Swiss-Prot record:
Alphabetical keyword list: Cytoplasm, Fatty acid biosynthesis, Fatty acid metabolism, Isomerase, Lipid biosynthesis, Lipid metabolism, Membrane, Oxidoreductase, Prostaglandin biosynthesis, Prostaglandin metabolism, Transferase, Transmembrane, Transmembrane helix
Residues carrying the site annotation Essential for protaglandin-E synthase activity: 49, 126
Membrane topology, as annotated: Multi-pass membrane protein
Outcome of mutating residue 36 to E: Keeps about 40-50% of prostaglandin-E synthase activity
EC number(s) recorded for this UniProt protein: 5.3.99.3, 1.11.1.-, 2.5.1.18
GO molecular function: glutathione binding; glutathione peroxidase activity; glutathione transferase activity; prostaglandin-D synthase activity; prostaglandin-E synthase activity
Protein name stated in the entry: Prostaglandin E synthase
Outcome, altering residue 114 to V: Retains 21.3% activity of protaglandin-E synthase activity
Stated family: Belongs to the MAPEG family.
Species assigned in the record: Homo sapiens (Human)
Quaternary data: Homotrimer.
Claim: GTP-binding is one of the keywords in the record: no
UniProt catalytic activity: prostaglandin H2 = prostaglandin E2; 2-glyceryl-prostaglandin H2 = 2-glyceryl-prostaglandin E2; prostaglandin G2 = (15S)-15-hydroperoxy-prostaglandin E2; 1-chloro-2,4-dinitrobenzene + glutathione = 2,4-dinitrophenyl-S-glutathione + chloride + H(+)
Metabolic or biological pathway, per its Swiss-Prot or TrEMBL entry: Lipid metabolism; prostaglandin biosynthesis
C-alpha cells in the first residue's frame, strides 16, 4: 500500500502525524538545550566528559541541568502515551475537527509546559499547562476503552 493511502485511510491520521512529529522534534530540542546547559554550567554526568572539559571536578550536578532533565523526563511520561493513544484514536473514526482539537490542545499544552518549566515561570502556569495537555489524552483513552469494550 502506498504511503499516501495509509495516511488517507483515516482523516485524523495526518493531523496526528503532524502533531506527534512536532512533539518528537520538541523533545530533541529539550535534549539539545540540556547539553548546552551542561556545557555552559560545566556540569557533566560522566567523568570522561568532565575530563574533556576541564577536569574531574566538573563531574557534578547542577540545578539548571536537573531542571532540563526533569522537563525531558516529564515529556517522556506524557508524550509517549500520547503517541500510542493518538495513533489508536485516529483509527476509531473520530470527527476530524474534534481529533485535530485533541492533538492541537496536547501539542500546545506540552510546548507551553516546556516553556514554563525551562523558563522557571511562576506557579501555577506549569501545572495548568500539564493538566491542559492531559485532558485530550484522558478523552482519547476513554474513547479507546469504550470502543474496545464494545467489541469484546
Amino acid at each position: 500500500m502506498p504511503a499516501h493511502s495509509l495516511v488517507m485511510s483515516s482523516p485524523a491520521l495526518p493531523a496526528f502525524l503532524l502533531c506527534s512529529t512536532l512533539l518528537v522534534i520538541k523533545m530533541y530540542v529539550v535534549a539539545i538545550i540540556t547539553g548546552q546547559v551542561r556545557l555552559r554550567k560545566k556540569a557533566f554526568a560522566n567523568p570522561e566528559d568532565a575530563l574533556r572539559h576541564g577536569g574531574p571536578q566538573y563531574c557534578r550536578s547542577d540545578p539548571d541541568v536537573e531542571r532540563c532533565l526533569r522537563a525531558h523526563r516529564n515529556d517522556m511520561e506524557t508524550i509517549y502515551p500520547f503517541l500510542f493513544l493518538g495513533f489508536v484514536y485516529s483509527f476509531l473514526g473520530p470527527n476530524p475537527f474534534v481529533a485535530w482539537m485533541h492533538f492541537l490542545v496536547f501539542l500546545v499544552g506540552r510546548v507551553a509546559h516546556t516553556v514554563a518549566y525551562l523558563g522557571k515561570l511562576r506557579a501555577p502556569i506549569r501545572s495548568v499547562t500539564y493538566t491542559l495537555a492531559q485532558l485530550p489524552c484522558a478523552s482519547m483513552a476513554l474513547q479507546i476503552l469504550w470502543e474496545a469494550a464494545r467489541h469484546l
